[in-house]
Amino acid sequence: MGLPYENATSGDKAIGEIQKMLRAFGCQRFATGEDYETGELFIQFEHRGRMVHLKASARGYAAAWLKEHPYSTRMRGTRADHEAKALKVGGVAVYSILRDWVKGQVTAIEIGMMTFEAAFLSHILLPSGVSVIEHIQAQKMLPAPSNA
């Protein structure tokens, strides 16, 4: 069947679309980057004084892609080549996923379905530099998930 977004072709195009969308929404600052050590890609933007930091894991997507497309000795190339391809696919796919997620959130805000804070609360950065969700998790403010 394949994974959603596995055939996405341009991470740069998705980044440009996100930037254009957020600028039209009224954001003052926009940045993207990559943590080579963790394989995480990020988008950061500021809206009305609130800094938002969105992260996505190219490695996480690559792992899912490898489950969907396991390496076989019948394939051209080595296992390392196949894993490198998975990471490349993941790097493009996660920006497309972020683009669609941000578009959904911005649309929900614009039509009055939710507020900016409701849409992005867990990703808003606190003055300490950690996100709201990271702070909540560190303080153990949420009950543990049930095993049901």
What are the residue ranges of the model-derived segments?
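A short, surface-exposed helix-loop junction/capping segment
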Residues: M1-E6
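Intrinsically disordered, low-complexity regulatory regions enriched in serine/threonine/proline
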Residues: K55, A62-A148
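Compact, well-ordered interaction domains used in eukaryotic information-processing assemblies
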Residues: G11-Y61
